[in-house]
């Protein structure tokens, strides 16, 4: 049962497979404007299957789809930001022959989310400004399509819905609303995130935090976002962790690499450094809130992870933890500075939880070839 504040993700965005092909910028902008209008609620739908055909094949029987999916994970875990265009091309090609596969749309959405979230890695960033502007609404539209297929079409008996998807849709909806300064869209995304947390609190509380981590520290939205991280830990350990002394050593016997709880720890293969990423975010979030003593305990928790020594972004957490945290906290005070320190790895959004290797020294290949 949902609470009144929760919003079930509706089936109100459709991207035909033809719209996913690489297009010149002049054609993409009208496309995304139309997608955004649907997002805001112009094109509502009932939530029924709508007569769409049952998928004729899954990714296990489609070699093109399987190869595209495997290559995405190779690029993603390999910290290969320069490989995003290759991953996009393969996923778009796979969608042409496997258009009812939700995984393809979800991963294609992830490439756009990754692209804009780490745009400083693109040496052509100035030339790609139009592309970055399209990335977030494109990601949201693709996550909506993936969720539609995953939640609202028929599947074989035993199929398990992917409850990560409402979280991805929610956070990209909020960020799209923030990009366009559209308060109703932000509110819509927040409602989707509430539903996502209801479905999968261990994972989606992190998305609810990430949607508002840049809000001013004294706002209700920031306090609620910070509380979402606490709620995520509570869901992981099955009890209410001490907010003043959040030592996680007593709960290490709960570490697992299976089921939903693997999202909490370091045993999962999709996000092997999810635990360290959570600790970094919550520690930094507590510093922003002025809770320095609790932040120090939280930073120390990261060392409990079996794979902490191999975490490619370990030095970021260690340098922050060793710094003057009171001085850092002061930078978040109202009017203190226009550019306070970020609450995650600077200029990184995805890789510090997912990447298994350090960043390669490589040149970025343009995402789109712009033609006159």
Regions from the PLM with identified roles:
Residues 61, 65, 102-103, 154, ...:
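Helix-start (N-cap) detector for alpha-helical repeat units in TPR-like alpha-solenoids
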Residues 346-358:
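The canonical Cys-X-X-Cys-His
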Residues 105, 157, 166, 206-207, ...:
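Canonical tetratricopeptide repeat
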Residues 47-55, 59, 63-90, 110-195, ...:
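Short coil/linker segments at helix-helix boundaries
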Residues 99, 151, 198-202, 237, ...:
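Short coil turns that delineate tetratricopeptide repeat
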Residues 105-112, 142, 282, 286:
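TPR/Sel1-like alpha-solenoid repeat signature
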Residues 1-23:
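N-terminal secretory signal peptides that target proteins for export/translocation
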Residues 28-39:
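Bacterial N-terminal signal peptides
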